[in-house]
Amino acid sequence: MTLTLNRQLLTSRQILVAFSGGLDSTVLLHQLVQWRTENPGVTLRAIHVHHGLSANADAWVTHCENVCQQWQVPLVVERVQLAQEGLGIEAQARQARYQAFARTLLPGEVLVTAQHLDDQCETFLLALKRGSGPAGLSAMAEVSEFAGTRLIRPLLARTRGELEQWALAHGLRWIEDESNQDDSYDRNFLRLRVVPLLQQRWPHFAEATARSATLCAEQESLLDELLADDLAHCQTSQGTLQIAPMLAMSDARRAAIIRRWLAGQNAPMPSRDALVRIWQEVALAREDASPCLRLGAFEIRRYQSQLWWIKSITGQSETIVLWQTWLQPLELPAGLGTVQLTAGGDIRPPRADEAVSVRFKAPGLLHIVGRNGGRKLKKIWQELGVPPWLRDTTPLLFYGETLIAAAGVFVTQEGVAEGENGVSFVWQKTLS
């Protein structure tokens, strides 16, 4: 049998293969191993994600290790925990998998996955069930951007039946995930109950849905081209979206712009209802309001007549973090990242008798460099254009009870270095 994967997509010499040990990924890895034989410059690695959902998960790891050892493919095993609130098990598992893939990819490597034509049909039907538009109905692309590289699906034009023929012809062994028989999961319900009926009635139903998905993708690509100038006009250098240019747009055009802006932020595709709420409840809220719409772990906010897509962060106004070894980086709470004092800068280092801490609020009138007179911190934030949601999560450096600096924003007159021995207060963020 000849290789069934689309070799024209495999332009990279470094490949990371998502390997569950099931039929699809076993055939994919086997074909890539054969392709490597024909192309000695190719480097293959595999990754297996242990979700911890099945009592057989450890046995699956052993199976994958044995297969990869036999085929001389280095294997990475990533163990993940599912704890994302508000998501079903399927969505949690998928999210954890792709986060593991992103962490494991090496520079220059592409990710290759084993989705096939039947998977594409299921994805299309799931999008149809959700009431998706052309973007959702485009289903999966053979090549897409992922984690700064590419995600390639070289089996997308092949049916599961073709993959099974390959596996049987080559004597391959694979695992069967018992959860695949549980039709309480939407995708399994389609695979086990719905698609077989449709295929029985219309044998080429999967191919037809794939063509529809391709047509939807073409329409979406055309819309991207036609709306590129509008999006560029509305979007700022900070990645925010200006509201004013969208006021005169039709509802459909405005919604398309907001969708594309969110896609650029790597946000999940919003529902039609969410798009209406973004415009009505956030963009058009009262001028004196501070509107916020939660979408999963993120928020859409309005500030200075712009829409902002931000990670939800718990305010830290009551938090005080002692920094006893200030020569070392300090980890901040709530996943805010780390801060450190580095040599060279306009902040004086602490004296031996000064306790160093990081806080997120400061009382009284403050005197900052570049401003005359004293001001309360709230007024300083307003004057410097710091968005409200950053005001109680921006690290403030204190020596004793004296505010010295706000990371990346200002230095107080009490914190100014004298001479050439200053330091910088550097904040390494982990959240957008």
UniProtKB/Swiss-Prot annotation:
Biological process terms in GO annotation: tRNA modification
Gene Ontology terms: cellular component: cytoplasm
Main subcellular localisation: cytoplasm
Reactions the enzyme catalyzes: cytidine(34) in tRNA(Ile2) + L-lysine + ATP = lysidine(34) in tRNA(Ile2) + AMP + diphosphate + H(+)
CDD domains: TilS_N (cd01992)
Keywords tagged on the record: ATP-binding, Cytoplasm, Ligase, Nucleotide-binding, tRNA processing
Residues annotated for ATP binding in this entry: S20, G21, G22, L23, D24, S25
Cellular compartments annotated: Cytoplasm
InterPro entries, A to Z: Lysidine-tRNA-synth_C, Rossmann-like_a/b/a_fold, TilS/TtcA_N, tRNA_Ile_lys_synt, tRNA_Ile_lys_synt_N, tRNA_Ile_lys_synt_subst-bd
UniProt key word Nucleotide-binding: yes
Pfam families assigned: ATP_bind_3, TilS, TilS_C
NCBIfam families reported in the protein's UniProt record: lysidine_TilS_C (TIGR02433), lysidine_TilS_N (TIGR02432), PRK10660.1 (NF007942)
Domain notes: The N-terminal region contains the highly conserved SGGXDS motif, predicted to be a P-loop motif involved in ATP binding.
Annotated function: Ligates lysine onto the cytidine present at position 34 of the AUA codon-specific tRNA(Ile) that contains the anticodon CAU, in an ATP-dependent manner. Cytidine is converted to lysidine, thus changing the amino acid specificity of the tRNA from methionine to isoleucine.
Name the UniProt record assigns to this protein: tRNA(Ile)-lysidine synthase
Organism whose genome encodes this protein: Shigella flexneri
The gene coding this protein: tilS
